[in-house]
Regions:
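N-terminal leader/targeting and accessory segments in enzymes
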Residues: 1-97, 101
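Nucleotide phosphate-binding/pyrophosphate-handling subdomain across enzymes
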Residues: 3-6, 18-26, 273-377
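Phosphate-binding loop of NTP-binding sites
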Residues: 6, 22-25, 63-67, 76-222, ...
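Residue-level detector of alpha-helix initiation sites
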Residues: 13-14, 79, 117-121, 284, ...
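Short internal beta-strands
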Residues: 29-36, 218-222, 355-356, 375-384
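Beta-strand->loop->alpha-helix junctions that form or flank phosphate-binding loops
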Residues: 34, 58-60, 96-100, 142, ...
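C-terminal helical cap/extension that packs against the catalytic core
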Residues: 42-54, 366-420
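Conserved small/polar residues in nucleotide/adenosyl-binding loops
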Residues: 422-425
């Protein structure tokens, strides 16, 4: 566990602080570093628990400190190819991420959930199912969901279960991380500003199963080309789910029913309208994945179904906010890539006024615009990508576009545009 080694933690966000705390508990010599010139060493020190012995450096890292480092822990937001990391890698310094560091302290079993979209909903639902079966004190929900693995790993025991939402950024820096159940919900273009190529992004997602064996399970989406292809190469035993195709082995949707099939023998598990509070086909897929994961952990279907029936939308994910003046307001602000945003539009059943925009992740918007298909009444755009999105929309013949500089202005425009029979979804 890096005891006695001089460890550099790069990044002073919540993941970096968690890593520094865990390293100190395990008697490493810690340097907490942030390259921001807007911070000082004292700012970093203030983020750590009182009594921390970690050295804290902001701005430029002194060469003598860099050359003394024996291991480096990267926060998820730190690219693996920055000059500092490249220099240390060339010197043979051990490079790992917060997830790998947490796993080194893990004592129990791990479930790891990744995918372009649906991670948080599936992870949250899976966590609730595990709590219901194994107990709240034996279940830890960690990772990209906002709770660093490193803050929970040393609380685990041989009979505990850790459920992790793992991003592609976090998967770039794993080496021994070994979940007993993994899941890749889907893979569509995203974060290409970080990964540069689709091939690199896919490889990062597939890494979640890299240390698994056939004794382990990997839950995969049959309807997604990338994950279906991986089923044939996966080192774990693949378990498939589909919302479009009936499967001889796996979980699938037939009409309103989720069915489990084992060698063609079918078992009806639930009704998506009577037993689910979530909206949208994307959430049916998330529920199927959670069922597959839970059954892989030997949780009885009765327990699974009880939790699903009481489960509501995760904040910011096709989340119903309110009805005001006859207009339904939905918050889908976690739909931060075109495919996720498409799912939000599909979930709407009436004409929609849509807010879009944000920072540029080098995404293509053609399929998103095509998904409007008469449902989107008007598009209100904001942020760095608004002109790029508007140009794409006009190319596809959609010209009902308005611009806003603030979210307050967005909401005012949407309210003006909406009518009593219409919905608005914010993303």
């Amino acid at each position: 566990m890096l005891e006695g080694k001089k460890c550099l933690v790069i990044g002073s966000g919540i993941s970096g602080i968690g890593a520094a705390v865990l390293l100190e508990k395990n008697h490493a010599d810690v340097v907490l570093y942030d390259s921001s010139d807007k911070l000082t060493g004292e700012d970093l020190k203030a983020k750590l628990p009182e009594g921390s012995r970690a050295a804290c450096i902001a701005g430029e890292l002194p060469e003598n400190v860099e050359l003394s480092i024996q291991a480096a822990v990267l926060s998820p937001g730190v690219p693996t190819d920055i000059p500092l990391v490249n220099r240390m890698r060339d010197r043979g310094v051990q490079i790992l991420g917060e997830i790998e560091l947490g796993f080194l302290a893990e004592q129990g079993r791990v479930i790891a959930i990744t995918g372009t979209n649906g991670k948080t909903t599936t992870t949250t639902l899976t966590g609730e199912i595990m709590k219901a079966h194994f107990g709240k004190d034996k279940t830890f929900v960690v990772g990209n969901i906002g709770n660093p693995y490193t803050l929970e790993a040393d609380k685990t025991s041989k009979d505990s279960v850790t459920v992790g939402e793992i991003s592609s950024f976090q998967l770039e820096t794993i080496h021994t991380f070994h979940p007993v159940v993994s899941a890749i919900l889907n893979i569509t273009p995203d974060h290409l500003n970080r990964h540069h190529t689709m091939e690199a992004y896919v490889a990062a997602k597939e890494a979640v199963a890299s240390q698994q064996t056939k004794a382990d399970i990997c839950v995969l989406n049959y309807d997604n080309d990338y994950t279906r292809d991986f089923a044939g190469r996966c080192p774990a035993t693949p378990v498939l789910f589909s919302s479009h195709q009936e499967l001889e082995n796996g979980y699938f949707l037939r009409g309103d029913k989720i069915i489990k099939s084992v060698n063609g023998e079918e078992h009806e598990l639930m009704d998506i309208h009577k037993d689910m509070n979530l909206v949208g086909l994307c959430n049916v897929e998330n529920v199927m994945a959670a069922i597959a994961i839970a059954e892989g952990m030997q949780v009885p279907m009765e327990t699974i179904l009880t939790v699903i029936r009481g489960f509501h939308a995760v904040e910011h994910r096709i989340e119903f906010v309110a009805t005001k003046g006859g207009v339904d307001y939905y918050n889908d602000s976690k739909g931060t890539n075109p495919d996720a945003a498409i799912q939000g539009i599909k979930a709407m059943s009436r004409p929609t006024v849509l807010i879009g925009g944000g920072y540029d992740k080098q995404s293509e918007y053609d399929e998103w615009i095509d998904s409007f298909d008469g449902k989107v009444k008007c598009l209100v755009l904001i942020g760095q990508t608004r002109e790029k999105i508007a140009e794409c929309a006009r190319k596809h013949g959609f010209d009902k576009i308005r611009f806003a500089d603030t979210y307050e202005e967005c909401l005012k425009l949407c309210t003006e545009l909406a009518r009593s029979e219409e919905r608005r979804v914010g993303k």
